[in-house]
Amino acid sequence: MEIINSRYKMTDTVLGKGGFSEVFLGTDMYTDNKVAIKKINITGKNSSDIKFLNKLDFEIRTMQILNHPNIVAYYDVMKTENYWYIVMEYCNFGTLNDVIKFNKNKGISSLDLEKNTHYYLNQLRDALNYIINMGYIHRDIKPMNILLTKSISENNENNENTNYDRSNSLILKLADFGLTKKCSENEEDIMNTICGSPLYMAPELFFNQHYNSQSDIWSFGIIMYQLLFHDHPINATNYSQLKNGLKNQKINFPKNNMFSNYCFDLLSKTLAKDPKNRLNWSELFHHYWFIHWSEQHCPKNKSDDSNNKKIPDKSQFNEILSSTKSPLISLRQFGQLGQSNLSKFKNNGAINCSIDFPKYTNNFPSAVNQSIKIGLSGSSSPINIPVRNNSSKKINYDDIELISNGNIFPETLYGSISPVDSIINKETRNKTNNPSSLNLSEFVLSDYEI
């Protein structure tokens, strides 16, 4: 038992583990609600590893910015000499991996299985639509990073014999933003680091090709396949078999299931090995299976309506403009929030704003200090908010962040230049001399530059 910041009681119950962190069950003593507390070890080499600390800081700032019913909520962060503690929403109903096992063992009809799959993927689609519009790519989408919950009161109850059928109205929550990266609205924005979980990584990452945000669409397709067929589309038990299968094995769809043509169409187009033939995000979000098939077969229930109408407890704009502890936010994200989200929140105390700055669409001036004008509704004159870039040359405005409390935290890339085979060898060197013995279901690659 550990008391953190005189508010959170952290138990010894471990909810999950990572390379340098553990997630414990805790309680917010102010509200008596259960929370999840991620305890991150920053001792030893981590304490002086600027890239590690920048990555951790970026993960926290990303969680502070993202606010959506289908994303695990961020509550608080505390820092001590040896540990950082991130307090998050507690999800007590397992992960999407439990749904896959449930579908496999229940033996339900094809139609009910498709409805169940649709119920969860529709929520994942909403979460991904949100983070893409916010200018992020997740890069580690997998069932273990997709949590399930209900209301706070139900979350504080025992969840024995959980029914993962859609009738139980579980809410999906996308989690773990440790590998998340800012990306451009342009889907051709090229990534130059290898990361993710091999079983869910797109083929282009295995063969030293640059990739873009469509790699997450492949991960979406793998999850859809697993929900429907209870297995991975590539028959592999180790890394070498997986890579060979991605190169040479045709993805087959079992024919003994009577799923709709729209379901198969979406599945096959998300699992196109060539990213040029894969769906783009707009095509995924507006696919017939989500828009029209659901109207015929999946009428909305009460949880769907309440989930869609949920409004964040506070305006991110009010937090950014008024609080000295507000998170940094990139200029692009600030603009996207203003354009796409504020109209939904204006009855919740949010400000209505517009951004006025010169048309530096491709480049922002190289001067160290700049400011942008934010026009506030109900105000006769705009206010100026300082921005700063950390480059002596002209840079894309994605790299410019609003200044909060005088602090600048530039996002950095990190890792070693190495093809994926060498990375696998490096990561497994201390465990085994044979990378083929790698446990694919538990292994995660961090950022490695290509």
From Swiss-Prot:
ATP binds at L15, G16, K17, G18, G19, F20, S21, E22, V23, K38. Its EC number is 2.7.11.1. Disulfide bonds: none annotated. Residues 9-290 form the Protein kinase domain. SMART domains: S_TKc. GO terms for biological process: regulation of autophagy. This is Putative serine/threonine-protein kinase R517/R518. SUPFAM superfamilies: Protein kinase-like (PK-like). The lineage of its organism: Viruses, Varidnaviria, Bamfordvirae, Nucleocytoviricota, Megaviricetes. Keywords: ATP-binding, Kinase, Nucleotide-binding, Serine/threonine-protein kinase, Transferase. It catalyses: L-seryl-[protein] + ATP = O-phospho-L-seryl-[protein] + ADP + H(+); L-threonyl-[protein] + ATP = O-phospho-L-threonyl-[protein] + ADP + H(+). One of its GO terms (molecular function) is protein serine kinase activity. It comes from the Viruses. Belongs to the protein kinase superfamily. Ser/Thr protein kinase family. The active site is at D140 (proton acceptor).
